């Protein structure tokens, strides 16, 4: 156990309660935070679901709003003293509606998983049939995977991708829907590198009399700028996280153009699934939505996609197999089987070299989820940092060096990894965080 945990806690008296900084009262926590800052500052982040928020977003999240309970919705709270947090939440709602060109928004979900759960609570009954993309094809746990609540409470039917193209086969999805007659079909996922045809999904749900829920957590930033087609004209309800490509605080959100569905969603979020909203996080969401409404955000998203294409192209020249042959979005899947490597093995080697990513299953993967045959890479965080095409070309070459080093020495190649780590640190020093 860390020796710092056994140290006596300082006495924080009323006289210094509002003035004593974290470093003076909780040195173990402060040290861990500082170490994490150093890690983020000195390493390259390629986890596709992560990003780097602005200083303004962080400041909003660290305000006195953390003190305020506000069960209910603006103008309809169960507590007094909510006039100012009402303003904050209404700003977040109006900006979300403007950003995604929709009629209704609920900004209270604590996460994307909570948002998905609230939709299911609002629109489904236990035992109903749902259809979602399988995990190995690029779906998400909350879309009906067996370990998740959605896989336990509902009759979850999973669709996959075409074995040849590794993309969604809409004819196969239609055939499954006609066979199983689901109450809801879920589109979206956590590892889909190609554009999703939401109009095709709407055609299928209309044919079988189902509801269409789109989880756009990964592509929300792309949708906001028009870089990916919006699901709002087609979906009955849309969920998203507020981080990832949207570059806000960690949280969730639910959007719809249906007043009837909106009312059900509001009741499902509170009091159905959650209690008090996290008002400091909602403030940070409002700030992030405001940033995303600015013209520079479109430039950012265009760079995210361009950088992803560059990274994929470089990796292909280094002998890597990119699932579907490339990407239309911010992420890519690398099939490691041609190099005889495993996802967990490569994740660890890249981290030793100062590059963080995650092991990830690939379509029709025969490896266990904690091993996998692939890795997932994304460009949002690096692009937020200021990396452009030239930097991502370098990053692609460094990843290629680490992979080739592993092929030569499967237990790890310290010489290669240490050399890459030096280059990574030098690059990161040119693009510091929060300076």
UniProtKB/Swiss-Prot annotation:
Enzyme class: transferase
Requisite cofactors: pyridoxal 5'-phosphate
Pathway entry: One-carbon metabolism; tetrahydrofolate interconversion; Amino-acid biosynthesis; glycine biosynthesis; glycine from L-serine: step 1/1
Keyword line: Amino-acid biosynthesis, Cytoplasm, One-carbon metabolism, Pyridoxal phosphate, Transferase
GO cellular component, one term: cytosol
Cellular localization per UniProt: Cytoplasm
GO MF annotations, alphabetized: glycine hydroxymethyltransferase activity; pyridoxal phosphate binding
EC number in record: 2.1.2.1
Annotated site, Plays an important role in substrate specificity, chain positions: 243
N6-(pyridoxal phosphate)lysine modified-residue sites: 244
HAMAP family: SHMT (MF_00051)
NCBIfam families: PRK00011.1
Annotated PANTHER family: SERINE HYDROXYMETHYLTRANSFERASE, SERINE HYDROXYMETHYLTRANSFERASE 1
Family to which this protein belongs: Belongs to the SHMT family.
Subunit structure of this chain's protein: Homodimer.
Name recorded for this polypeptide: Serine hydroxymethyltransferase 2
Species of provenance: Vibrio cholerae serotype O1 (strain ATCC 39315 / El Tor Inaba N16961)
Taxonomic placement: Bacteria, Pseudomonadati, Pseudomonadota, Gammaproteobacteria, Vibrionales
Name of the gene this protein is made from: glyA2
């Amino acid at each position: 156990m860390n020796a710092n945990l056994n140290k006596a806690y300082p006495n924080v008296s009323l006289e210094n309660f509002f003035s004593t900084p974290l470093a003076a009262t909780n040195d173990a926590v402060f040290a861990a935070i500082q170490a994490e800052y150093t890690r983020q500052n000195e390493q390259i982040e390629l986890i596709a679901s992560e990003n780097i928020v602005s200083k303004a977003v962080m400041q909003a999240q660290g305000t006195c709003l953390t003190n305020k309970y506000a069960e209910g919705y603006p103008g309809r709270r169960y507590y007094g003293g909510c006039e100012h947090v009402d303003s904050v939440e209404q700003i977040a709602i109006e900006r979300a509606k403007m950003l995604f060109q929709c009629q209704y928004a609920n900004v209270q979900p604590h996460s994307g998983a909570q948002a998905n759960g609230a939709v299911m609570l609002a629109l489904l009954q236990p035992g109903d049939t749902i259809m979602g993309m399988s995990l190995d094809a690029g779906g998400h746990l909350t879309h009906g995977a067996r370990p998740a609540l959605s896989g336990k409470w509902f009759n979850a039917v999973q669709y996959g991708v075409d074995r040849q193209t590794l993309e969604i086969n809409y004819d196969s999805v239609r055939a499954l829907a006609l066979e199983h007659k689901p109450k809801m079909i879920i589109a979206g996922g956590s590892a889909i590198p190609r554009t999703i045809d939401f109009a095709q999904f709407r055609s299928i749900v209309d044919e079988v009399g189902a509801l269409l829920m789109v989880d756009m957590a990964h592509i929300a930033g792309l949708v906001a700028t028009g870089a990916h087609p919006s699901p709002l004209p087609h979906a009955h309800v849309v969920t998203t996280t507020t981080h990832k490509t949207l570059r806000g605080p960690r949280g969730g959100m639910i959007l719809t153009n249906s007043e009837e569905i909106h009312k059900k969603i509001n009741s499902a979020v509170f009091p159905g699934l959650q209690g008090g909203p996290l008002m400091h996080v909602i403030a940070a969401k409002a700030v992030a939505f405001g940033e995303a409404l600015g013209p520079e955000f479109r430039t950012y998203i265009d760079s995210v996609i361009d950088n992803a294409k560059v990274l994929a192209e470089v990796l292909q020249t280094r002998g890597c197999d990119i699932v579907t042959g490339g990407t239309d979005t911010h992420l890519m899947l690398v099939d490691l089987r041609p190099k005889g490597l495993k996802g967990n093995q490569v994740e660890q080697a890249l981290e030793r070299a100062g590059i963080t990513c995650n092991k990830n299953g690939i379509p029709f993967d025969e490896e266990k989820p904690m091993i996998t045959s692939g890795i997932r890479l994304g460009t949002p965080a690096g692009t937020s940092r200021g990396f452009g095409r030239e930097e991502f070309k370098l990053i692609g070459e460094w990843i290629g060096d680490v992979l080739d080093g592993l092929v030569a020495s499967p237990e790890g190649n310290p010489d290669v990894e240490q050399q890459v780590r030096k280059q990574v640190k030098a690059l990161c020093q040119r693009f510091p965080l929060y300076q």
